[in-house]
UniProtKB/Swiss-Prot annotation:
Subunit structure: Heterotetramer of two alpha chains and two epsilon chains in early embryonic hemoglobin Gower-2; two zeta chains and two epsilon chains in early embryonic hemoglobin Gower-1.
Coiled-coil annotated spans: none
Cited SUPFAM superfamilies: Globin-like
A Pfam family: Globin
UniProt organism field: Bradypus tridactylus (Pale-throated three-toed sloth)
Protein name (database record): Hemoglobin subunit epsilon
Top-level taxon: Eukaryota
GO CC term, one of those recorded: hemoglobin complex
Amino acids binding heme b: 64, 93
Annotated function: The epsilon chain is a beta-type chain of early mammalian embryonic hemoglobin.
Domain Globin: 3-147
Amino acid sequence: MVHFTAEEKATVASLWGKVNVEEAGGEVLGRLLVVYPWTQRFFDNFGNLSSSSAIMGNPKVKAHGKKVLTSFGDAVKHMDDLKGTFAHLSELHCDKLHVDPENFRLLGNVMVVVLASHFGKEFTPEVQAAWQKLVGGVANALAHKYH
C-alpha cells in the first residue's frame, strides 16, 4: 500500500483540478501507442493506428484516453485505497483483456510526461515526485489481480 502525506495529496489534487481530462487523456493514450507500439494490439478495433498522426488524431484513441484519465480522477479522490478503487479494472485487464501489467507503468510514465508538458514550470520536482508516486500506486493496484 502506498502512503501519501497530506502535502502530496494536496499537490496532486491541486494540479488535477487544472487538467483538461479530454485533451490530456487523448494525448496520454496516443503517446503510449506511438512510443510503445506493441500496446496497439489491445486496441485493434480502434481503426487506423498506422502512424503517429493517425493515432493522435484517432477519435477512438481520444475517447478511450478520456476514459483512462477519468479513472485517474478516481485515484486522486481515493488515494488511500487505490487497490480497492481499481479492483474491478484490475480484474478486467487481467482476466479478460490479458494486458501485461508492465503496460500500466508505461502508461503512468507517459502521463507524467504529458502533465509536465502541459504545466511547464508549475510541474516542479515536488509535483513530479507526488505524481510519480500516484501513478506507481495506480500501476500496482491495477497489477494486483495478477499476483
